[in-house]
Amino acid sequence: EGINNLKTVNDNAGIAPVEVDEAIIDLLNDCKRYHELTVGMVNPAMGSVLALWHEARDDGINDPAHAYLPDSEKLAEAATHMDPDAVVIDEAASTVYLSDPKMRLDVGAVAKGWSVQRVCENAPEGLLISVGGNVCATGAKDDSGTPWVVGIQNPDGGEEYLHTLYVTKGSV
């Protein structure tokens, strides 16, 4: 109780701005920047659309014989509520307001990598931090500058890596 997060913001869509921690403001500002950089491919405001897909996925997992795709009309309706400009961030007041009452935020495409990057920014030099597919190096492996070796797994399975990267500083 007393902690406001993205669920609280979503619950107050179209109702009132919600005071949030500075980290949420930073995350949402970065999400908006990623939206611009990717020409809309990353959109933190598409939670209403993603909720329909998540529901269909979960229902299919629980009852595979009755798996289904989300209704196209419901998807089209939800897609009218994903304008990132309707995410109103007031940094001075540390609030977030969704001006569209049917909009929902979903930062799943960004949050894990973003969080790992924040950890790495404050970590000592010479670490390799791996969190579920997001990898960040904070410096060379040793004093001689040896890079970390990061293997890119084949999403189709198999033992062989698709590619090997040599990283001293940065995220993969």
Per-region residue spans from a language model:
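Mature catalytic core of soluble alpha/beta enzymes
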Residues: 1-172
